[in-house]
Amino acid sequence: MQHFSRTFLAASIATALFAPYAQAEAILNNSVQEMPTTDQCLVDAEKNDANAEIVIQADNLQAINGDKAIYSGDVEVTQGNKKITAESVTLHQQENIVVAEGNVTFNDGEVKASSSKVTNNMTSETFSLENTEYQFLCQQGRGQAAYIAKTGQAVYELEDGSITSCPADDNAWRLVASSIEVDQDEETATFYHPRFEVLDVPVFYAPYLTLPIGNTRKTGFLFPSVNYGSSDGLEIEVPFYWNIAPNYDLTLTTLYMQQRGVKQDADFRYLSDGWGSGELKGEYLPGDEKYNDEDRWGYQYKHDGIINKQWLVSLDYSQVSDIDYFRDLSSDLGNREDGQLMQQGKVAYRSDFWDMSLQVRDFQILLQDNNQPYRLLPQVKFNFYTPLLGNYLNFDVKSELTQFDIQDASKPNALRAHVEPGLTIPLSTSWATWTTEARLLATYYQQDLDRLTDPTLKSQLDETVARVIPEYRSHARIYLEREAKLFEGYTQSLEPQIQYLYVPEEEQGNIYNYDTTLLQTDYYGLFRSRKYSSIDKIAAANQLSYGASTRFFDDEYKERLNISFGQIYYIDKKTKLTGNQEETSNYSSWAVETDFNYEDFLFYHGGIQYDIDLNAMQLANSTLEYQFTDGFIQGNYRYVTKDYIEDTISFDELDKITRKGISQAGIVGAYNINRHWSASGQYYYDLTEEIDLEWMASLRYQSDCWYIGFTYTNQLVKWRNDVVGGDSNNPVYDTNISVNFGIQGFATKNKAETAAKELDSTDNAITYGRPFYLNN
């Protein structure tokens, strides 16, 4: 039998009987050249037009009564972005329906599939697929189904189907259900009687489940994560996300802990129109089995907003059930500082020449000691500033009114009022600045001594104190620049500076210390006007600070090296705060800071304070980090003498912290072994006590759709008898081995990170940091 060519069938027979539906092969070939890649998402492309021409080519064609045509042999049907291939295709002219059978492939730019049968209404663009393997092209998701129907513009119904975010030939996990509804516009999938399978083994069942399948915020369950640790045993976390409105959402998380019970977490977020944004978090663990069956809870409310560009509102209030809450349970509640949970609110107003604020601050103590901080109930600040003679003279006033309150009866409550007017003469050129200022610090205290239980302290303090102290400061700085002679191609700057500071000595022993601490005197601290963080103690000064910085910049003006050094000369040695003034010189310790960046892969930072009277270091820190394509390694060291600690902070029980000062060395590293495997670790050692401080090692495997991590931690948590060192005071460690497992893809709460990035979020006491301060 003679075989007719495909061109003859398409152009002669089909055109005569079904002119609107069949075109010559030449037209088809031109169309094929313009079609995009078949596996490409075309959801943003021009939508298929139901009136677009239908192009069919096949080896054979049979026409029946002008009503339908049967195509067979390598049949290919195209309409706009849609393409169907099959062994046989029947075209029903009246209904404009195509029925394809036998090794059918289907692709409409949103889903591609391989099926035994496809029925497609070419007018309404609805279709059904039988015995199908499918893959969504515009969202994650692939799987199998006995029957798939597209009932809307982007709505799919699957019967006896499955879905996974894993790539082809990877069935690490999948969701199997009797019925699945997928809405690609809403990016949600609804499952009826789903079961979750890992390596084809069912591990979870629910009668009903809704999951997001895209990156936009959609209501539904997020995939669970599994963790096993030697401290709390098996942990299973199941989050549910509720997209209440475009500016409101709520995440509810159920956390099962084998050795503690079931913990419920809630996180509500909002974004208001003109009032800012906020967040309300709550956590509740009834009957903690490892904490005497006590209920444990915590909450935080946080709001930040700018109103009418001038009003600022900030609120951060947190509270937990007990002081061991954060030690026992993993939680990101609150703002914690120095063993205290902050509870504070602030309202501020700013204009062109003045600003004011009202602040209230309280704490929840998380340590078992008597070192309670003061509450601010409240603190009001007012500042005014204006130029008087153009840019040659500025006038400003700083003021505050603070009520200090504390529950500890061994410390006084107080009202503090402070007014600080100042005149500033700022002079500047392109290569130098010179700022001279004079200020008057006037402070009034009303101290409540009746409640004091300490008679010695009561005799030292006065109920009312009025203190007025003048301050004079003159600070000059020069910027010089040249082509570097030592390093060709680099620009070197030299920035010497000098400052004179005078503050007369004033007896202040009758004033209690409410919120003031001694500031660290590093290189940049040499040129401050104050030695303390607040105004309860105004240190006398008659001193000359001097120092210089030199910087090296490459041809792109990227800073590569910075060396700074300086010192204070005390004209009046009595104003020197540290050491015995009779036995020491008029000079402070040398302060040196160094930063180095070599070709963006080798970084160094170091700081030293060298005491010239003792010919010894007081304080030092050093960090060296080498970065390479797939990871980094960092070594660091910190050193502080006990004398420096005693001079800097006021702590009655220093032996609970250190016997000989601080001398600690550490090494931190991370490496992405390949596309899937990564490892990280850190180790810190105390050279004074010759003991381990902290161990952490992590190994993680991460595929395209799941991850598993193994972590070992060993941390020094305290000393026996609460005293550092000694034969009977052994260190106490907390050791934990954990395994965590999670799903990647759609509906995951947090995408799994590599082990290197995990260093930023570990629960270890000493976390990974990059203390490099070059201007890059």
Swiss-Prot record:
GO terms for cellular component: cell outer membrane; transporter complex. It is found in: Cell outer membrane. This is LPS-assembly protein LptD. The keyword Cell inner membrane does not apply. PANTHER family: LPS-ASSEMBLY PROTEIN, LPS-ASSEMBLY PROTEIN LPTD. It comes from the Bacteria. Together with LptE, is involved in the assembly of lipopolysaccharide (LPS) at the surface of the outer membrane. Residues 1-24 form the signal peptide. The lineage of its organism: Bacteria, Pseudomonadati, Pseudomonadota, Gammaproteobacteria, Vibrionales. GO terms for biological process: Gram-negative-bacterium-type cell outer membrane assembly; lipopolysaccharide transport. InterPro entries: LipoPS_assembly_LptD, LptD, LptD_C, OstA-like_N. Pfam families: LptD, LptD_N. It comes from Vibrio vulnificus (strain YJ016). Keywords: Cell outer membrane, Membrane, Signal. Belongs to the LptD family. The gene is lptD. Component of the lipopolysaccharide transport and assembly complex. Interacts with LptE and LptA. The keyword Membrane applies.
